């Protein structure tokens, strides 16, 4: 938590400590809560990239467990639209645009397509300006 809420970008030992969180999380789920191996493997590999550039192992494509590929898509979207140290918060539309651009590199293309078909571009509660100049949203 101290690293997550600290100064970003991380360097040196802090960066390496942060990169160990998938393995630590998977081990915690396995030993403390007896989650099935398929779940803990998904947690451990949720920072793997579809093209093999991720961590902690460097797996690619369908060698990355399905749970990990799903967590990668959903966790990345949440991270992009949330306020986090060291990165700009994106609008849902910008996050979706990024995910579409990175499908096949960072993300599994089929899972991005499934996620985006089920995801609203304008989540509940956001303000939308209509072409006639009217505002729509929860507050209006």
Tell me what each language-model feature is.
Residues 1-140:
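Histidine- and acidic-residue-rich, metal-dependent catalytic cores
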């Amino acid at each position: 938590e101290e690293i997550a809420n600290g100064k970003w970008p991380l360097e040196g030992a802090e960066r390496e400590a942060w990169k160990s969180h998938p393995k630590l999380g998977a081990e915690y789920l396995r030993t403390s809560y007896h989650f099935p191996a398929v779940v803990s493997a998904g947690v451990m590999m949720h920072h793997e990239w579809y093209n093999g550039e991720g961590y902690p192992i460097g797996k690619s494509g369908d060698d990355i467990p399905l749970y990990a590929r799903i967590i990668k898509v959903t966790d990345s979207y949440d991270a992009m639209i949330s306020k986090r140290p060291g990165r700009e918060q994106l609008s849902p539309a910008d996050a979706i645009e990024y995910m579409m651009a990175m499908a096949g590199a960072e993300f599994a293309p089929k899972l991005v397509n499934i996620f985006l078909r089920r995801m609203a571009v304008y989540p509940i509660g956001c303000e939308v300006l209509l072409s006639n100049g009217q505002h729509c949203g929860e507050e209006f």
